[in-house]
């Protein structure tokens, strides 16, 4: 699962399952359905299988965010131009919640994370449905993400060079960008 932080929502990519992508935004209070949690539920939940080791790759499109899901013991920064990695294994079906745990701007408090853990069979059914649902939405998300990845490569070179020397002139690291 690839996770991309944005001001102020998350994008999720499933590269091992057809590479479909969707955005997950907080559900406004006046649109909540019975059983949905205020400030915690999203319009689209991440769906993951129980009992499987899952690689989580995280980055950001704009500023520093933090993808935090306490029940998984995960709290990892999403950094523009960098891909951070961790692994999880969910052992029990259910819905798990988290939030952006890094102050990232004015609407930081409205970046919930909602994950639904399901059986392997239900996950496969969901993937089949999601591949169709998210492939049929032609909103330009995939091209924007491809462009973002190119911009991130360029930004990484710039960031590596600009942060190699502190304001008082101390050299912290040698930039290897472009070598």
Question: Which stretches of residues belong to each language-model region?
Answer:
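Non-transmembrane, membrane-proximal soluble domains of secreted or membrane proteins
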Residues: 1-179
